[in-house]
């Protein structure tokens, strides 16, 4: 028979302190700590243009190895029909998402090393933007050098830890429609993160995150389909002539690649297959000039071949290294190596030897989440032919590729933007593919407003309730819903609506938290009251027994029934940001990022790496 052990009255104060302290402390730390991330004055901000609220800093994900992910959050300019958040991650692996923030979809771009200007094509018009340097050690993120991430599952688990803590800090966003976007090797990251979110939601449906879509630009998704596309793309662009001696050399390299894949299937990358692109760049060099592998319309010095692109890198690296910028973004001094666009050490450690390629996750993801794959037509390294090939072979939601009925394929619908041919759209069974003409590996860098129009269409943005002048964007000549706006016509009213909705969301989150804390207080108070009554009655019974010990009258018995309460339930587990401690030694250059021995800079990365200075 089990008995409930009840503490003595003098221990109730201590029990209350121990039980409520972590809960109330976490709630207070969450609300107070959010202010610590507020970016009060980013150096070089333009005097004109919207005033955009920002938060930035580190969140610890692996305390045992001092692993922290750096984030930079920009609040949306307007709320259309609902609140949305786009999470952006760049590729590499090991390349910083500040590329996306400062050169692609963020609200500001660099005019020079000192000054910013407003990006009129920012994806933040109708969505909050959350940029994350992922995995640990990338960009401003940090970790001990012996604890770099090696596998995609490990990366996704750490990202979930980050999101749990981030939403605890900023609960006003945890009911947003969430979209995850990125490019290049993010074609591996994003499906794994999405799967981890969906798995989490199934385990805790009452606190599910509202994942509404994935966007992958020029992604490295399916090696078996994308390696051969190097040669196909070189033929299409006239870089390599079919049947030429150079073509024969490349075909021989491709056969070797295919033998390795056949003998060891299901890997994310193959060193032997990397040689195909490297050989194309070497065979087509003209003196010290070579093709820019991120934009074949351009050239670069050999062996960089695109690593000096885009030109904004000339300003970005020194800007993010400035002390006033580092301080404004709350970057810890423990990031001793400073900001670097791509980390060879992170990329070299991320072997993913036990991870299957993300293409194998897409069929199940497409059952639950819409996916948009978009390709810049002039990118070589993750070119559109490889993406189109993987789609044609992919089986999902009862069909194969874009075949809608036997022998009938979903049409490629012409897309025009402000009177110019922009590309085409193709979609079926929850998958959308967009080819964007006149654009590179980094589509939003080249065509920010078109890329935002693509985003708004995919998210189903409805601007009818805020006014403004929509762009002239048409699919097959039909304008359809007005999705993109250059600026709200009634900015005061729009800003007021935005602010009120933010307040409402924050209030709801606060009410929910307060209700949880009050519930715990009520439970503890009830237990205390019950214990008090039990003690008083027991004292009364003892008094009766002593006073009437010769009187054989009846005696009263008491049975305390109690159901133990979980005072530290997961419902209250919203832990504050752990303190940063420990430094991160400087990282070494990885063998996967070969260098010119006469030049200390990284010169060549694998097919999925982002450009580096």
UniProtKB/Swiss-Prot annotation:
Enzyme class: hydrolase
Subcellular location per the Swiss-Prot or TrEMBL entry: Golgi apparatus, trans-Golgi network membrane
Membrane-side (Lumenal) residue stretches: 28-513
This protein's UniProt keywords: Apoptosis, Carboxypeptidase, Glycoprotein, Golgi apparatus, Hydrolase, Membrane, Protease, Signal, Transmembrane, Transmembrane helix
E.C. designation(s): 3.4.16.6
Catalytic reaction annotation: Preferential release of a C-terminal arginine or lysine residue
Chain intervals for the UniProt region annotation (Disordered): 466-499, 569-597
Topological domain ranges for the Cytoplasmic compartment: 535-613
Extent of the signal sequence: 1-27
Name of a matching Pfam family: Peptidase_S10
Carbohydrate attachment residues: 120, 430, 438, 490
Record field: transmembrane: 514-534
GO terms of molecular function: serine-type carboxypeptidase activity
Composition-biased stretches (Basic and acidic residues): 471-481
Entry annotated with the keyword Nucleus: no
InterPro entries: AB_hydrolase_fold, Peptidase_S10, Ser_caboxypep_his_AS, Ser_caboxypep_ser_AS
Membrane topology summary: Single-pass type I membrane protein
Active site annotation, chain numbering: 184, 379, 441
GO cellular component terms attached to this protein's record: membrane; trans-Golgi network
Skewed-composition ranges (Polar residues): 486-497
Gene Ontology biological process: apoptotic process; proteolysis
Biological function: Protease with a carboxypeptidase B-like function involved in the C-terminal processing of the lysine and arginine residues from protein precursors. Promotes cell fusion and is involved in the programmed cell death.
Record-stated family: Belongs to the peptidase S10 family.
Protein's recorded name: Pheromone-processing carboxypeptidase KEX1
């Amino acid at each position: 028979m089990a008995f409930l052990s009840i503490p003595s009255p003098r221990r109730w104060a201590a029990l209350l302190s121990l039980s409520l302290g972590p809960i109330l402390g976490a709630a207070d730390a969450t609300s107070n700590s959010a202010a610590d991330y507020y970016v009060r004055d980013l150096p070089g901000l333009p005097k004109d243009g919207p005033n955009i609220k920002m938060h930035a800093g580190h969140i610890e994900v692996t305390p045992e190895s001092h692993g922290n992910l750096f984030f930079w959050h920009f609040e949306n300019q307007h709320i259309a029909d609902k609140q949305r958040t786009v999470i952006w991650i760049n590729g590499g692996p090991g390349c910083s998402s500040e590329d996306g923030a400062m050169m692609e979809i963020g609200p500001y771009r660099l005019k020079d090393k000192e000054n910013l200007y407003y990006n009129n094509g920012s994806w933040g018009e109708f969505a909050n933007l959350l940029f994350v340097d992922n995995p640990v050690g990338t960009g401003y993120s940090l970790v001990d050098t012996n604890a770099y991430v090696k596998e995609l599952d490990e990366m996704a688990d750490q990202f979930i830890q980050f999101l749990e803590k981030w939403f605890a800090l900023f609960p006003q966003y945890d009911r947003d429609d969430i979209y995850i976007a990125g490019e290049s090797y993010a074609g591996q990251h994003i499906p794994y993160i999405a799967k981890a979110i969906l798995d989490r939601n199934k385990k805790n449906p009452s606190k599910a995150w509202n994942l509404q879509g994935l966007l992958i630009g020029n992604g490295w998704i399916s090696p078996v389909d994308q390696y051969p596309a190097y040669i196909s793309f070189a033929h299409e662009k006239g870089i390599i002539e079919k049947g030429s001696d150079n073509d024969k050399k490349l075909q021989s390299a491709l056969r070797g690649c295919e033998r390795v894949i056949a003998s060891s299937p299901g890997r994310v990358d193959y060193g032997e297959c990397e040689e195909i692109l490297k050989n194309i760049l070497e065979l087509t060099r003209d003196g010290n000039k070579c093709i820019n592998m991120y934009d074949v319309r351009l050239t670069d010095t050999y062996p960089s071949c695109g690593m000096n692109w885009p030109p904004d890198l000339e300003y970005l690296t020194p800007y993010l290294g400035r002390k006033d910028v580092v301080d404004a973004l709350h970057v810890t001094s423990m990031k001793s190596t400073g900001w670097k666009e791509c980390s060879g050490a992170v990329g070299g450690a991320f072997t993913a030897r036990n991870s299957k390629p993300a293409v194998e996750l897409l069929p199940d993801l497409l059952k639950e989440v819409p996916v948009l794959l978009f390709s810049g037509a002039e990118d070589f390294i993750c070119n559109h032919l490889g993406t189109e090939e993987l789609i044609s072979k992919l089986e999902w939601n009862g069909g194969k590729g874009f075949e809608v009925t036997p022998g009938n394929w979903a049409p490629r619908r012409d897309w025009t933007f402000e009177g110019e041919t922009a590309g085409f759209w193709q979609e079926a069974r929850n998958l959308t593919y967009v080819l964007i003409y006149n654009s590179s590996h980094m589509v939003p860098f080249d065509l920010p407003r078109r890329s935002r129009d693509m985003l708004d269409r995919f998210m189903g943005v409805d601007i009818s309730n805020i006014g403004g002048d929509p762009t002239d964007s048409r699919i097959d000549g039909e304008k359809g819903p007005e999705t993109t706006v250059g600026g709200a016509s009634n900015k005061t009213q729009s800003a007021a609506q935005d602010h009120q909705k933010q307040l409402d969301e924050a209030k709801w989150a606060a009410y929910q938290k307060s209700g949880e804390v009050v519930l715990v207080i009520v439970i503890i108070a009830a237990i205390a009251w019950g214990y008090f009554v039990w003690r008083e009655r027991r004292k009364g019974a003892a008094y009766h027994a002593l006073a009437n010990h010769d009187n054989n009258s009846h005696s009263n018995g008491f049975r305390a029934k109690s159901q133990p309460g979980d005072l530290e339930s997961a419902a209250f587990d919203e832990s504050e940001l752990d303190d940063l401690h420990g430094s991160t030694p400087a990282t070494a250059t990885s063998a996967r990022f070969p260098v010119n021995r006469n030049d200390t800079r990284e010169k060549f990365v694998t097919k999925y790496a982002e450009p580096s200075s």
